[in-house]
């Protein structure tokens, strides 16, 4: 296995010769260290079945299936499927997922530490995923803004981007919203926390899932504060030219693994009617999102 920093990129590394089936514990430790410090590891030359992809995920931590079944792979439920390509006339997975800034499972009480994405069918145009390193973004905040958010908490919810399921057709929207709030109530996390693997300070907000900010007593703060944070970190830049934004491209055989604690991401969906399919596995590693979350 050879790990090389991606040339010209501030974050990321290319990993050649990685085989999850034969990798030693030292190889796995080196890979995970790269994920935490370089944020994105691109495993090159991968050719895996769904079962093998899950096995790779298990080398890095404990996989968890997505809570809504319509996203799950029909044979391997721990695989989340994003696809606009029907199989035998049947929709497998969900098309155009993640077209907004977010961290995976940010709206849940116990988010994942590591995300793995394995593109299956890659469009010719507009391929890739946008990322923002929220540790680096925090470092770049003005000092007065850092002081303003010190000791605050943010509320995260899936409600804004929840996708209607097949069995929701003809149901009253109020009934669907009530179910969403009951199954996935908003969660509160510190606005910033110390990354347990690197010691860096992470700004844990996303335009997609973060819906409010409050003081340490739970009193809501002005929504304008959140908007200023979104703007300062680059999440409101629709040109995607902000200094904080990194576009990670990929080719057939690439498998992306990234640090879900400090990165937020946004899918770059093709604007042309091209087929696109990707698989995702998300895993819990040795530590919780931050040390303020109690171990189960």
Curated annotation (Swiss-Prot):
Q: Which GO terms describe its molecular function?
A: dioxygenase activity; metal ion binding
Decide whether keyword Cell wall biogenesis/degradation is in the record. Answer: no
The Enzyme Commission number assigned here is: 1.14.11.78
Q: What are the protein's UniProt keywords? A: Dioxygenase, Iron, Metal-binding, Oxidoreductase
Give the matching Pfam families. Answer: TauD
Tell me the residue numbers annotated for binding 2-oxoglutarate: 269
Positions annotated to bind Fe(2+):
102, 104, 265
- Where on this chain does (3R)-3-{[carboxy(hydroxy)methyl]amino}butanoate bind? 66, 71, 98, 105, 163, 280
Q: Which cofactor does it need?
A: Fe(2+)
Question: What SUPFAM superfamilies does UniProt report for this protein, alphabetically?
Answer: Clavaminate synthase-like (SSF51197)
Summary of the function given for this chain in its UniProt record: Involved in the biosynthesis of a unique class of isonitrile lipopeptides (INLPs). Catalyzes the conversion of (3R)-3-[(carboxymethyl)amino]fatty acids such as (3R)-3-[(carboxymethyl)amino]butanoate (CABA) to (3R)-3-isocyanylbutanoate (INBA) through an oxidative decarboxylation mechanism, thereby generating the isonitrile group of INLPs.
Additional note from the record: Isonitrile formation goes through two consecutive, but distinctive, 2-oxoglutarate-dpendent reactions catalyzed by this enzyme. In the first reaction, an Fe(IV)-oxo species is utilized to generate a (3R)-3-{[carboxy(hydroxy)methyl]amino}fatty acid. Then, its conversion into a (3R)-3-isocyanyl-fatty acid likely proceeds by decarboxylation-assisted desaturation. In PDB structures 6XO3 and 6XOJ, the 2-oxoglutarate seems to be in an off-site binding mode (overlapping with the substrate binding site), which is not the binding site required for the reaction to proceed. The latter seems to be inducible and requires His-269.
Protein name per the record: (3R)-3-[(carboxymethyl)amino]fatty acid oxygenase/decarboxylase
* Species in which this protein is naturally found: Streptomyces coeruleorubidus
């Amino acid at each position: 296995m050879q790990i090389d920093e991606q040339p010209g990129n501030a974050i990321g590394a290319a990993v050649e010769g990685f085989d999850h089936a034969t990798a030693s514990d030292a190889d796995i430790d080196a890979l995970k260290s790269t994920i935490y410090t370089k944020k994105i590891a691109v495993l090159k030359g991968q050719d895996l079945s769904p079962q093998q992809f899950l096995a790779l995920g298990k080398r890095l931590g404990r996989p968890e299936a997505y809570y809504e079944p319509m996203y799950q792979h029909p044979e391997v439920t721990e695989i989340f499927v994003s696809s606009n390509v029907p199989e035998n006339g049947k929709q497998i997975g969900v098309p155009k997922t993640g077209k907004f800034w977010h961290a995976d499972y940010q709206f849940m009480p116990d988010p994942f530490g590591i995300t793995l994405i394995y593109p299956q069918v890659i469009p010719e145009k507009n391929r890739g995923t946008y990322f923002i390193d929220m540790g680096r973004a925090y470092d770049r905040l003005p000092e007065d803004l850092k002081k303003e958010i010190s000791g605050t908490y943010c509320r995260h919810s899936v409600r804004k981007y929840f996708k209607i399921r097949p069995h929701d057709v003809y149901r009253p929207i109020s009934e669907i919203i009530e179910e969403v709030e009951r199954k996935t109530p908003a969660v509160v996390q510190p606005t910033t926390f110390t990354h347990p693997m690197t010691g860096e300070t992470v700004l844990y907000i996303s335009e997609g899932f973060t819906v409010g900010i409050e003081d340490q007593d739970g009193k809501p703060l002005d929504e304008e504060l959140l908007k200023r944070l979104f703007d300062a970190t680059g999440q409101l830049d629709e040109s995607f030219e902000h200094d904080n934004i990194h576009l990670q491209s990929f080719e057939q055989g690439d498998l992306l693994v990234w640090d879900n604690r400090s990165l937020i991401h946004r899918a770059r969906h093709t604007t042309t009617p091209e087929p696109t399919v990707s698989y995702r596995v998300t895993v819990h590693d040795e530590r919780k999102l931050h040390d303020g979350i109690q171990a189960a």
